[in-house]
Amino acid sequence: MPPKKRRRQSQKAQLLFHQQPLEGPKHHYESCQQPITHTVQVPSKPIDQSTVTSWVSPQFDRAAESRFLIHWKPHRDQARRPTRRSTCKFPRLTFESPQSSSSETLLLSNRVQPQNSEKDPPRRPLVPLFSPQSCGELSVHVPHSLPHVFAPPDIQTPDSSVRDDPISPDQKENSFPSCILGPGTPSSPEPGPVLVKDTPEEKYGIKVTWRRRRHLFAYLKEKGKLDGSQFLVKI
């Protein structure tokens, strides 16, 4: 068992002096208080509490609020009860979709179709139709530098365009990427600047320091002052 703590007296007894000061109590930090001899009587008026605070704005008058806050205490049972999930009282927000192009609506309508339609006959997937006007609009929005180009599937063109301009299937495949990429895009990217030149075959196995000092390397090699271990790379 640990030893019991002894309770100490918080308030110490006042010191008692056997002799009283001869000249009365002394004030070290301020002047001595002289006795009041002349007194004047002033007539007093009763104060009305209702008129005193009439100029105070009601939003700053917290006398009534402080009364309720003092007596209010949270109950123990209220703290233990779990918080219930409150349902949302506000209506859901409705978003208006912007006007999309005809090609986007065709692709979205194909995705929205139910998957469990077994009785319906199989249909061909919808493919967006590109006209010369739409190709011109796409060339403005699509960036000119594309990493790769996909070959399009079988494109269904309207009958009127087929009758006017008969085009072979090979020309269709070639015209589709050109209308997307635009006429000014190059077919292959241009090679960039050469950072490091290739090492010639005759200099294989020679250290880089001696490749840069060609004249000194040839002179020392002719004089026989360079060994093979000094200028050759060890493998």
Swiss-Prot record:
Region listing for Disordered, in residue ranges: 75-106, 111-130, 149-198
BP GO terms, sorted: cellular response to ionizing radiation; DNA damage checkpoint signaling; double-strand break repair via alternative nonhomologous end joining; protein localization to site of double-strand break
Polar residues bias locations: 96-106
PTM-bearing positions, type Phosphoserine: 50
Record-level Gene Ontology MF annotations: chromatin-protein adaptor activity
Segments carrying motif KEN box: 171-175
Main location: nucleus
One GO CC term, this protein: nucleus
Record flagged with keyword Ion transport: no
Modifications made to the protein after synthesis: Phosphorylated at Ser-50 by PLK1, promoting interaction with polymerase theta (POLQ). Ubiquitinated and degraded by the APC/C complex upon mitotic exit.
InterPro entries recorded: RHNO1
Compartments where found: Nucleus; Chromosome
Keywords: Cell cycle, Chromosome, DNA damage, DNA repair, Nucleus, Phosphoprotein, Ubl conjugation
Residue positions of motif D-box: 123-130
Record's compositionally biased regions (Basic and acidic residues): 161-173
Entry's free-text remark on domains: The RAD1-binding motif mediates interaction with RAD1.
Oligomer status and interactors: Interacts (when phosphorylated by PLK1) with POLQ; promoting POLQ recruitment to DNA damage sites. Interacts with RAD1; interaction is direct and promotes association with the 9-1-1 (RAD9-RAD1-HUS1) complex. Interacts with RAD18. Interacts with TOPBP1. Interacts with UBE2N.
Role summary: Involved in microhomology-mediated end-joining (MMEJ) DNA repair by promoting recruitment of polymerase theta (POLQ) to DNA damage sites during mitosis. MMEJ is an alternative non-homologous end-joining (NHEJ) machinery that takes place during mitosis to repair double-strand breaks in DNA that originate in S-phase. Accumulates in M-phase; following phosphorylation by PLK1, interacts with POLQ, enabling its recruitment to double-strand breaks for subsequent repair.
Protein name from the UniProt record: RAD9, HUS1, RAD1-interacting nuclear orphan protein 1
